[in-house]
């Protein structure tokens, strides 16, 4: 068993703080950017515009993550405290919201440049697990998104929360949604799935949503929401929606791949 008493602040210079969570965003975006340009982009037209696309992507991620959290997880509070929506430093980001932000940013950028937005979304999908991995590690350091009580040998006590030993669900997600998902997508990328725009995106949605859905059974639900319809969490409900959308993409895009 392990005791988690990590400091969420990575670096502090006088009153300026750089937190692990912020650092995870920076590292995830930079590494994703690097691998995308060095390995996964084969189209020169997309490569030449990718740096500009990153600006859209960053804005989409930040706004999407925040608005997603506000809308999906704590709408009643923010309706009565509108100014707090802008206080991102107080916490409250949603991956599913960020995913919607990325999709919208990709559509807007591709439309501006008269390109298929799936060409960009597939690249983001195959590199996203890198950012997810570091993001979940940061969640672990921050003692947030923790699991239910357990007696497994690898249980963790989050001292800033209580004295219970819990499932380190952040590490489960880092492993499955980060490392394992990256390996799966690389497997399909090597088999030419990137040649059919939308297939890699569909696979990402299916596998991410599946991993997230099952790990959520071990995770403490959001305090302000608890369990919802069919005793599922909000994260599980949204994951089902994205799973269905990913399945739709696979069916339609794979048919197009066979025709071509």
Question: Where are the regions that the model predicts?
Answer:
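A feature for loop-to-transmembrane-helix boundaries and adjacent hydrophobic helices
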Residues: 1-260
């Amino acid at each position: 068993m392990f005791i988690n008493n990590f400091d969420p602040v990575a670096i502090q210079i006088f009153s300026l703080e750089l937190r692990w969570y912020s650092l995870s965003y920076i590292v995830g975006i930079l590494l994703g950017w690097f691998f995308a340009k060095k390995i996964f982009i084969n189209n020169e037209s997309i490569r030449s515009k990718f740096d500009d696309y990153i600006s859209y992507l960053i804005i989409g991620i930040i706004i999407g993550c925040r608005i997603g959290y506000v809308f999906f997880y704590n709408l009643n509070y923010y309706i009565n405290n509108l100014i707090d929506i802008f206080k991102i430093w107080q916490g409250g980001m949603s991956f599913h919201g960020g995913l919607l932000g990325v999709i919208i940013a990709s559509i807007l950028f591709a439309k501006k440049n008269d390109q298929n937005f799936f060409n960009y979304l597939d690249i983001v999908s195959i590199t996203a697990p890198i950012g997810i991995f570091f993001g979940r590690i940061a969640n672990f350091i921050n003692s947030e998104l923790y699991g239910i009580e357990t007696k497994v040998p690898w249980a963790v006590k989050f001292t800033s929360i209580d004295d219970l030993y819990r499932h380190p669900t952040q590490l489960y997600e880092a492993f499955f949604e980060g490392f394992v998902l990256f390996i799966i997508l690389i497997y399909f990328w090597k088999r030419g799935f990137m040649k059919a725009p939308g297939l890699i995106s569909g696979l990402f949605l299916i596998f991410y949503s599946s991993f997230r859905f099952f790990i959520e059974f071990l995770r403490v639900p959001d305090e302000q929401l608890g369990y919802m319809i069919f005793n599922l969490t909000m994260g599980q409900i949204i994951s089902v929606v994205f799973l269905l959308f990913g399945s739709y993409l696979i069916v339609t895009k794979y048919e197009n791949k066979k025709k071509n």
